[in-house]
Amino acid sequence: MSARAAWLVQAGCLDYAQVWAWQRQLQDNRRNNPDRPDVLLLLEHPAVYTLGRGSSLAHLKFDPQHPPAPVYRIERGGEVTHHAPGQLVGYPILNLRHHRCDLHWYLRQLEAVLILVLANYGLTGERIEGLTGVWVEGKKLAAIGIQVSRWISLHGFALNVCPDLAGFEAIVPCGISDRAVGSLVEFCPDVRLEVVRSQVAGAFAQTFELDLQPCSLEQLQAEENLTAIAGDP
């Protein structure tokens, strides 16, 4: 069987709220037309905190009325996390009916993608029983949080390549107080985010058996009739 075609959109550092709105539009489009191609968005965000749908404010070390960066409560599972430049974020908008209708399988597949990427650097990415994400030598390098509606996925994964980790000090990342957050640059000082982005795309295509076809952000906006949120330039 030939690999299913999907769109790969690689962008720079984009506003969180705008990308979140686009994700929801992409998900809606696939709920209405399940045969539309899968999409993988790879990008970065300015500093921001996101809370899962059931996240506890107890994991914030700052006053929510005066946050150090914007805070959003979103649809994904999991506790609070932090995004910042230098962290590669991946948002797969997949119709899992074309893959497997199994959320546990999907989470493990996302972990497998990141483990493959880390192997390029001679690092052994590890899973921890009962938790979601990927660790290297006890440090969490990748976080995962998803939402699925009618088997169309939303949100995804974040790999710390070379971000300023100071932003994580203002929270209990993912609600896990006894495990440190780390980044790829700590283990590989010469790592470059654009190289990692390409490696993530390759590992994703391999793991999900997809033919990822480059698609510019402008093409995606036109194909999917994506709209800007109020106040976006």
Curated annotation (Swiss-Prot):
The record marks K140 as: Lowers pKa of active site Cys. Its EC number is 2.3.1.181. Its main location: cytoplasm. It holds the Pfam family LplA-B_cat. Catalyzes the transfer of endogenously produced octanoic acid from octanoyl-acyl-carrier-protein onto the lipoyl domains of lipoate-dependent enzymes. Lipoyl-ACP can also act as a substrate although octanoyl-ACP is likely to be the physiological substrate. HAMAP family: LipB. This is Octanoyltransferase. It comes from Synechococcus elongatus (strain ATCC 33912 / PCC 7942 / FACHB-805) (Anacystis nidulans R2). The lineage of its organism: Bacteria, Bacillati, Cyanobacteriota, Cyanophyceae, Synechococcales.
